[in-house]
């Protein structure tokens, strides 16, 4: 054979597979200190006024304690993104110091180098009111926001099965908030005590809620 190589195709294929395996990126488990959160949107089907309806689920989780907050909205948009934060901060009685996001167009105008982002004016308005630090996941690094994605699936299985039948979104969200409160009594896997125990440490690390309420609506400047 050319260059003196006498090995077969299978040997080459096995060698390439071994090289790829040895060079695969390894995602180490992330360690989350108290006072941090992750945010995401998902979807679910509910019966609203007798009609099957797809709703958008705003989810905020606290990885340290495992606490979760879920609310349903007609759709994912700037207004529901802002309102979801406002309600989550009220539910948790404080503001997480750092919040992790994907690169949704609601918050990000342009992805720059590394973690640098050009942010939308509405996201900056939210951040300047509550003073939390933003953290945007690197592209194709799903593990950086894995906690909220896992708990989104958990909420679908445990809060929305069987398919809830409600008269209104208000009624659905009251039920979801109650399920989130009840979930604080559950044990966290691998830990002693309930989720409510480490939530005390989360809250101790939170920023205080601002005295002035936040206007969770898109603000357009008059031309």
Kindly give the residue locations of the regions a language model identified.
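Short, basic interhelical loop/turn and adjoining N-cap
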Residues: 2-11
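Mobile-element integrase/transposase regions
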Residues: 14-68, 76-84, 215-223
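Acidic/histidine-rich, metal-coordinating catalytic segments
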Residues: 95-115
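Active-site-proximal acidic segments at structured loop/helix or strand boundaries
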Residues: 152-223
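Active-site beta-loop-alpha junctions of metal-dependent nucleic acid enzymes
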Residues: 70-98
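RNase H-like polynucleotidyl transferase catalytic core
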Residues: 122-123, 128-145, 164-166
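Short, conserved catalytic/metal-binding motifs centered on acidic residues
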Residues: 40, 66, 99-102, 127, ...
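RNase H-like two-metal-ion nuclease catalytic core shared by retroviral integrases
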Residues: 101-102, 113-114, 134-156, 170-172
